[in-house]
Regions:
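A general, composition-driven signal for non-globular sequence regions
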Residues: 1-2, 16
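Bacterial N-terminal signal peptides that target proteins for export
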Residues: 2-11
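General helical structural elements
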Residues: 11-12, 79
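Bacterial N-terminal signal peptides
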Residues: 12-22
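Serine-dependent protease modules
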Residues: 24-265
């Protein structure tokens, strides 16, 4: 074999090795910066306040045994005490008129809802409708200002291993972007009657509830709802698939509630 043939063989062998690597590298995003910059104005931070009523022990210094029926009986004789509590969450704008989607547990029993848009603009919001069973709520910002909405993607087309990004308000820090992949589909974790979660390893923490899970097209394919454990550091988060969420959201906007069919005698 002459030298030209040897060089040609080596070149062909190297080319065969490189081509699959180059093809695979196209699947890995070099940066999420452009996508995050486009989507962040549509993701909101939500803070709520509510009044909680507790009653003091009518017999200071005395503790009923665990499970004692007298504890509930005498609790009514205690002095009622009110205190203000607050909660944080996330959401995303789906209509230029200021319609926001979030989790029901973020706004449940809230007396005041404040939504922060694009980092510094704050608006009061009212609940259009909420559904505890699916843990979805829809809000209306009380303003005539126009906003940049995001759109829903087809969660049925999302595949295990696909890249995703989550944007939210972890620990009240404001717009925070994390990335990961879809780790599993059709997960049930015992939170509610209707469960079909997308599992992701994108970091989700307290305050991310109600925020969007985006695919690489910038479409919402999930609503971040739960984490496994007390914090999000273990890399297991769960999102309501967009196709399921859209059915509930459309009904909440139209009727203020969900209308489910029931079978019975």
């Amino acid at each position: 074999m002459d030298m030209y043939a040897v060089k040609k063989t080596i070149f062909t062998f190297i080319l065969i090795l490189i081509l699959p690597l180059k093809s695979f590298s196209k699947e890995i995003p070099g940066s999420f910066a452009d996508l995050a910059e486009r989507l962040m104005p549509s993701v909101v931070n939500i803070s709520t306040t509510q009044t909680v009523v507790t009653r003091s022990n009518p017999f200071p210094g005395f503790q009923f045994p665990p499970g004692s029926p007298f504890e509930d009986m005498f609790k009514e004789f205690g002095t009622p005490q009110e205190r203000q509590t607050s909660a944080l969450g996330s959401g995303f704008i789906i209509d230029a008129k200021g319609i926001v989607v979030t989790n029901n547990h973020v706004i449940q029993d809230a007396e005041d809802i404040i939504v922060r848009v694009d980092g510094d603009k704050e608006f009061k919001a009212k609940v259009i409708g909420s559904d505890p069973l699916s843990d979805i709520a829809v809000l209306q910002l009380e303003t005539k200002e126009k906003f940049t909405p995001v759109k829903f993607g087809d969660s049925d087309k999302a595949r295990i291993g696909d890249w995703v990004i989550a944007i939210g308000n972890p620990f009240g820090l404001g717009g925070t972007v994390t990335s990961g992949i879809i780790s599993a589909r059709n997960r049930s974790i015992g939170l509610s009657r209707y469960e079909d979660y997308i599992q992701t390893d994108a970091s989700i923490n307290s305050g991310n509830s109600g925020g969007p899970l985006f695919d690489m097209n910038g479409d919402v394919i999930g609503i971040n709802t739960a984490i496994l454990g007390r914090n999000g550091s273990i890399g297991i988060g769960f999102s309501i698939p967009s196709n399921s969420a859209k059915i509930v959201i459309d009904q909440l906007i139209k009727f203020g509630e969900t209308k489910r069919g029931w079978l019975g005698v």
